[in-house]
Regions:
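Structural signal for interior beta-strand "rungs" in well-ordered beta-sheet cores
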Residues: 1-187
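Terminal amphipathic alpha-helical/low-complexity segments used for targeting or macromolecular assembly
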Residues: 1-5, 10-11, 16, 53, ...
Length: 261
Protein backbone atom coordinates (compact mmCIF):
# COMPACT_ATOMS: atom_id res chain seq x y z
CA UNK A 1 0.00 0.00 0.00
CA UNK A 2 1.27 3.47 -0.92
CA UNK A 3 -0.39 6.44 0.79
CA UNK A 4 -1.65 9.08 -1.67
CA UNK A 5 0.54 11.78 -0.10
CA UNK A 6 3.74 9.76 -0.55
CA UNK A 7 6.06 10.66 -3.43
CA UNK A 8 7.39 7.45 -4.94
CA UNK A 9 9.55 7.46 -8.07
CA UNK A 10 8.25 5.29 -10.88
CA UNK A 11 11.88 4.27 -11.39
CA UNK A 12 12.09 2.67 -7.94
CA UNK A 13 11.55 -1.06 -7.41
CA UNK A 14 9.25 -1.77 -4.46
CA UNK A 15 7.56 -5.03 -3.56
CA UNK A 16 3.78 -4.67 -3.41
CA UNK A 17 3.71 -6.06 0.15
CA UNK A 18 5.64 -3.07 1.49
CA UNK A 19 3.68 -0.27 3.19
CA UNK A 20 4.62 3.34 2.39
CA UNK A 21 2.89 5.81 4.69
CA UNK A 22 2.00 9.51 4.48
CA UNK A 23 4.50 12.07 3.18
CA UNK A 24 7.30 9.60 2.48
CA UNK A 25 9.75 10.22 -0.38
CA UNK A 26 11.25 7.29 -2.30
CA UNK A 27 13.94 8.08 -4.89
CA UNK A 28 14.67 6.79 -8.38
CA UNK A 29 17.23 4.10 -7.62
CA UNK A 30 15.74 2.62 -4.47
CA UNK A 31 14.98 -1.11 -4.25
CA UNK A 32 12.76 -2.32 -1.40
CA UNK A 33 11.84 -5.93 -0.65
CA UNK A 34 8.90 -7.58 1.09
CA UNK A 35 6.83 -6.51 4.10
CA UNK A 36 8.71 -3.35 5.00
CA UNK A 37 6.84 -0.70 6.97
CA UNK A 38 7.80 2.85 6.01
CA UNK A 39 5.58 4.64 8.48
CA UNK A 40 5.49 8.35 7.56
CA UNK A 41 7.72 11.32 6.67
CA UNK A 42 10.60 8.99 5.74
CA UNK A 43 13.13 9.84 3.01
CA UNK A 44 14.82 6.94 1.19
CA UNK A 45 17.07 8.05 -1.66
CA UNK A 46 20.27 7.20 -3.54
CA UNK A 47 21.29 3.73 -4.67
CA UNK A 48 19.71 2.11 -1.62
CA UNK A 49 18.74 -1.57 -1.46
CA UNK A 50 16.54 -2.79 1.40
CA UNK A 51 15.60 -6.43 1.97
CA UNK A 52 12.57 -7.58 4.01
CA UNK A 53 10.61 -6.82 7.19
CA UNK A 54 12.31 -3.56 8.14
CA UNK A 55 10.57 -0.66 9.92
CA UNK A 56 11.35 3.00 9.26
CA UNK A 57 9.89 5.51 11.69
CA UNK A 58 9.05 9.18 11.01
CA UNK A 59 11.76 11.57 9.84
CA UNK A 60 14.43 8.95 9.31
CA UNK A 61 16.71 9.78 6.36
CA UNK A 62 18.11 6.77 4.55
CA UNK A 63 20.61 6.96 1.69
CA UNK A 64 21.19 10.72 1.44
CA UNK A 65 24.62 11.85 0.23
CA UNK A 66 27.61 11.22 2.53
CA UNK A 67 28.72 14.02 4.84
CA UNK A 68 32.23 13.97 3.40
CA UNK A 69 33.78 17.00 1.72
CA UNK A 70 35.66 14.69 -0.66
CA UNK A 71 32.41 13.25 -2.01
CA UNK A 72 31.92 14.38 -5.61
CA UNK A 73 28.59 12.85 -6.63
CA UNK A 74 30.08 9.41 -7.29
CA UNK A 75 27.61 6.53 -7.63
CA UNK A 76 27.68 5.00 -4.15
CA UNK A 77 25.56 2.43 -2.37
CA UNK A 78 23.71 1.57 0.82
CA UNK A 79 22.70 -2.04 1.49
CA UNK A 80 20.27 -2.89 4.30
CA UNK A 81 19.35 -6.45 5.28
CA UNK A 82 16.18 -7.70 6.98
CA UNK A 83 14.32 -7.21 10.27
CA UNK A 84 15.96 -3.92 11.23
CA UNK A 85 14.27 -1.02 13.01
CA UNK A 86 15.19 2.58 12.24
CA UNK A 87 13.56 4.85 14.79
CA UNK A 88 12.76 8.54 14.48
CA UNK A 89 15.42 10.87 13.03
CA UNK A 90 17.91 8.11 12.26
CA UNK A 91 20.31 9.01 9.44
CA UNK A 92 22.23 6.54 7.28
CA UNK A 93 24.60 7.54 4.47
CA UNK A 94 25.98 5.53 1.53
CA UNK A 95 29.67 4.95 0.84
CA UNK A 96 32.47 7.00 -0.66
CA UNK A 97 35.43 6.31 -2.94
CA UNK A 98 37.72 5.99 0.09
CA UNK A 99 35.66 3.16 1.56
CA UNK A 100 34.66 1.10 -1.44
CA UNK A 101 31.54 3.16 -2.20
CA UNK A 102 29.31 1.07 0.06
CA UNK A 103 27.70 1.20 3.50
CA UNK A 104 26.35 -2.15 4.74
CA UNK A 105 23.85 -2.98 7.48
CA UNK A 106 22.98 -6.63 8.01
CA UNK A 107 20.00 -8.06 9.94
CA UNK A 108 18.04 -7.67 13.19
CA UNK A 109 19.53 -4.35 14.28
CA UNK A 110 17.87 -1.59 16.30
CA UNK A 111 18.84 2.01 15.66
CA UNK A 112 17.19 4.19 18.28
CA UNK A 113 16.10 7.82 17.94
CA UNK A 114 18.66 10.17 16.42
CA UNK A 115 21.42 7.63 15.85
CA UNK A 116 23.72 8.18 12.86
CA UNK A 117 25.54 5.75 10.58
CA UNK A 118 28.06 7.53 8.39
CA UNK A 119 29.54 6.63 5.03
CA UNK A 120 31.31 3.29 4.51
CA UNK A 121 30.27 1.82 7.86
CA UNK A 122 29.85 -1.95 8.12
CA UNK A 123 27.27 -3.09 10.68
CA UNK A 124 26.85 -6.79 11.39
CA UNK A 125 23.65 -8.42 12.68
CA UNK A 126 21.94 -7.92 16.07
CA UNK A 127 23.61 -4.58 16.79
CA UNK A 128 21.93 -1.92 18.94
CA UNK A 129 22.64 1.81 18.77
CA UNK A 130 20.86 3.66 21.57
CA UNK A 131 19.52 7.20 21.24
CA UNK A 132 21.88 9.65 19.51
CA UNK A 133 24.75 7.18 19.21
CA UNK A 134 26.89 8.28 16.27
CA UNK A 135 29.30 6.45 14.00
CA UNK A 136 31.86 8.38 11.98
CA UNK A 137 32.93 7.11 8.56
CA UNK A 138 34.42 3.64 8.00
CA UNK A 139 33.43 2.28 11.43
CA UNK A 140 32.95 -1.51 11.63
CA UNK A 141 30.69 -3.07 14.27
CA UNK A 142 30.47 -6.82 14.68
CA UNK A 143 27.42 -8.82 15.74
CA UNK A 144 25.61 -8.34 19.06
CA UNK A 145 27.50 -5.18 20.02
CA UNK A 146 25.61 -2.49 21.95
CA UNK A 147 26.38 1.25 21.90
CA UNK A 148 24.93 3.38 24.68
CA UNK A 149 23.12 6.67 24.22
CA UNK A 150 25.09 9.70 23.00
CA UNK A 151 28.21 7.63 22.42
CA UNK A 152 30.50 8.61 19.55
CA UNK A 153 32.83 6.37 17.56
CA UNK A 154 35.89 7.76 15.72
CA UNK A 155 36.52 7.11 12.03
CA UNK A 156 37.94 3.64 11.17
CA UNK A 157 37.37 2.21 14.65
CA UNK A 158 36.34 -1.46 14.90
CA UNK A 159 33.95 -2.65 17.60
CA UNK A 160 34.15 -6.40 18.25
CA UNK A 161 31.22 -8.77 18.70
CA UNK A 162 29.33 -8.64 22.00
CA UNK A 163 31.20 -5.48 23.01
CA UNK A 164 29.36 -2.96 25.16
CA UNK A 165 29.97 0.80 24.93
CA UNK A 166 28.54 2.83 27.80
CA UNK A 167 26.44 5.94 27.32
CA UNK A 168 28.18 9.30 26.70
CA UNK A 169 31.39 7.50 25.69
CA UNK A 170 33.92 8.60 23.09
CA UNK A 171 35.83 5.76 21.42
CA UNK A 172 38.98 6.46 19.39
CA UNK A 173 40.60 2.99 19.25
CA UNK A 174 39.36 -0.52 18.47
CA UNK A 175 37.35 -2.38 21.11
CA UNK A 176 38.01 -6.13 21.32
CA UNK A 177 35.17 -8.68 21.16
CA UNK A 178 33.40 -8.97 24.54
CA UNK A 179 35.02 -5.76 25.79
CA UNK A 180 33.26 -3.29 28.13
CA UNK A 181 34.11 0.38 27.65
CA UNK A 182 32.87 3.61 29.16
CA UNK A 183 34.25 7.14 29.20
CA UNK A 184 36.11 9.39 26.78
CA UNK A 185 39.54 8.24 25.53
CA UNK A 186 39.60 5.73 28.36
CA UNK A 187 40.66 2.09 28.76
CA UNK A 188 38.51 -1.02 28.77
CA UNK A 189 36.82 -1.48 32.14
CA UNK A 190 36.46 -5.26 31.94
CA UNK A 191 34.88 -7.89 29.77
CA UNK A 192 31.19 -7.58 28.97
CA UNK A 193 30.16 -10.24 31.48
CA UNK A 194 26.45 -9.73 30.87
CA UNK A 195 26.99 -10.23 27.15
CA UNK A 196 28.91 -13.45 27.80
CA UNK A 197 26.11 -14.72 30.05
CA UNK A 198 23.51 -13.84 27.43
CA UNK A 199 25.53 -15.89 25.00
CA UNK A 200 24.99 -18.87 27.30
CA UNK A 201 28.45 -19.27 28.84
CA UNK A 202 28.83 -20.76 32.32
CA UNK A 203 30.58 -18.96 35.17
CA UNK A 204 33.54 -21.35 34.87
CA UNK A 205 33.88 -20.65 31.15
CA UNK A 206 33.71 -16.90 31.75
CA UNK A 207 36.40 -17.09 34.45
CA UNK A 208 38.66 -19.04 32.10
CA UNK A 209 38.16 -16.41 29.40
CA UNK A 210 38.99 -13.65 31.91
CA UNK A 211 42.22 -15.41 32.88
CA UNK A 212 43.30 -15.83 29.26
CA UNK A 213 42.44 -12.20 28.46
CA UNK A 214 44.66 -11.14 31.38
CA UNK A 215 47.51 -13.10 29.78
CA UNK A 216 46.96 -11.46 26.39
CA UNK A 217 46.92 -7.95 27.88
CA UNK A 218 49.70 -8.50 30.46
CA UNK A 219 51.45 -5.12 30.73
CA UNK A 220 54.88 -6.74 31.18
CA UNK A 221 55.09 -7.42 27.45
CA UNK A 222 53.39 -6.44 24.20
CA UNK A 223 50.09 -7.94 23.12
CA UNK A 224 51.85 -9.44 20.11
CA UNK A 225 54.46 -11.20 22.25
CA UNK A 226 51.89 -12.32 24.81
CA UNK A 227 49.92 -14.05 22.06
CA UNK A 228 53.05 -15.48 20.43
CA UNK A 229 54.50 -16.84 23.68
CA UNK A 230 51.34 -18.20 25.27
CA UNK A 231 49.18 -19.30 22.38
CA UNK A 232 51.49 -21.39 20.21
CA UNK A 233 48.49 -23.38 19.09
CA UNK A 234 45.08 -21.91 18.45
CA UNK A 235 43.01 -21.68 21.62
CA UNK A 236 40.23 -24.23 21.95
CA UNK A 237 37.98 -21.56 23.42
CA UNK A 238 35.98 -19.89 20.65
CA UNK A 239 35.81 -16.49 22.34
CA UNK A 240 39.58 -16.34 22.83
CA UNK A 241 40.14 -17.39 19.22
CA UNK A 242 37.88 -14.52 18.16
CA UNK A 243 39.78 -12.01 20.31
CA UNK A 244 43.15 -13.19 18.95
CA UNK A 245 41.90 -13.04 15.36
CA UNK A 246 40.63 -9.51 16.02
CA UNK A 247 43.97 -8.43 17.49
CA UNK A 248 45.93 -10.02 14.64
CA UNK A 249 43.86 -8.36 11.93
CA UNK A 250 44.53 -4.93 10.50
CA UNK A 251 43.84 -2.00 12.81
CA UNK A 252 43.93 1.58 11.57
CA UNK A 253 43.34 3.16 14.98
CA UNK A 254 45.15 0.89 17.45
CA UNK A 255 43.68 -1.23 20.25
CA UNK A 256 41.98 -0.04 23.43
CA UNK A 257 43.68 -1.82 26.34
CA UNK A 258 42.56 -2.49 29.90
CA UNK A 259 42.75 -0.05 32.82
CA UNK A 260 45.71 -1.76 34.47
CA UNK A 261 47.71 -1.68 31.21
Amino acid sequence: MIHPTAIVSNKSDIDTSTNIGPFCVIGDNVKIGKNNNIISHVSITGFTTIKDNNSFFPFSSIGAQPQDLKYNNEKSYLEIGSNNRFRENVTVNPGTVGGGLKTIIKDNCLFMVGSHIAHDCKINSNVILANNATLAGHVEIDENAILGGNSAIHQFVRIGKYAMIGGMSGVEKDIIPYGLYTGIRENLKSLNLIGLKRKGLTSNAINEIKNLINIIFDKNDTIENNIKNNFVESSEILEIKEVIEFLNSNSKRGITTFEND
